[in-house]
Amino acid sequence: MHALHRSLFLVALLLCMSLAGCTSNDASSSAGNSMTEEEKQLPEWTVGQNWLYTFITPQFGEDSARLVVAEIDNGSGEYVLGISSEREAQRHAVINHNPFLGRMTIDALAVYENGEPQQVFSFPWTVGDAWSFTLLGQQWDATTESLNNGNARVEAESSEGHELSYTFSGSKGFLERLVWRDGDGTIQLRMDLNIARSNYEGDVFFYRARDLIDRMYEENDQEIYD
């Protein structure tokens, strides 16, 4: 009789452990895919939508500025992003300090590098998606690693050993964080989102290198002939 009770107890124990394991696995699976269908989709931006970021680079240290949707050109199918800091806009014009300034495509939020749109984001977000793009002078192979708490996390590696890690917020419609490390492991660019808002009032800036050259020429010209 005691042997029978022991056998029944062991069976019940094993069954409980099995169920616990299944529950744990299901919970882990659910946690790894916790984005709503809406959050997985390509966002639609509006003029004035903005994101306040802290930018960190080895050249310039830490600075904060807002990326702002300054214009929507439905004819060309492009957004134009400006920035609230003129200094940051000038840095971008000289050394491509911020790759998300300027034109981005409406249909994919593709970023322009050397005049060609680059698919940095993969909508709708799906774990395991893999794709390639060029950004920051590097050719990247990227993979969507996880969907968690409304965010899609992407890991990318370049042929030169650089690493790019970034998180896209489905609820805020843009990057939550981005970190670019070079082949030595040094952080070359870090972006951290502080707050996202729908309306912006104020000046925004975007310069190309040609703009700065023209501006310098005009200033020098005025000094000479005044």
Predicted regions mapped to residue ranges:
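C-terminal motif of bacterial Sec signal peptides marking the signal peptidase cleavage site
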Residues: 17-21
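Acidic, serine/threonine-rich low-complexity disordered tracts
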Residues: 23-91, 110-226
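A cross-kingdom signal targeting lumenal/periplasmic-facing segments of multi-pass membrane
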Residues: 95-111
